[in-house]
Amino acid sequence: NLIKHSLLELANKNISIEKVHLFGGATSHSDVYEWKHASEIVKYGIHNFYSKKDSVLKYLYKTFELGDNPIGLNPISSNSKNIKNYDVSDTVKGHFEYKKNLQTILKNL
């Protein structure tokens, strides 16, 4: 939630940024309006990397957020051309594997 709310605050103040990379994010994927609004201030896009094999998000996030689905497990729901989703499930098998696989993930963009 922190990243999304920070982007929304920047959007409300008309402050733009270059690019955003999200890895295993623990915020809702389905806030379509909020994600579209947040993406409008990011010049080179919001890049969401998610893994369907992230058991931390699969069990803990869903338990504490009453079944909601996080962006770390799913694509961000948005029709914005400025939001790109990448399924890295073949490379990232768990929540703590993003850092060690970062070079591979970014090389395959």
Report the location of each language-model feature.
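Serine-dependent carboxylesterase/thioesterase catalytic core
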Residues: 1-71
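C-terminal catalytic-base region of ester-bond hydrolases, centering on the histidine
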Residues: 57-109
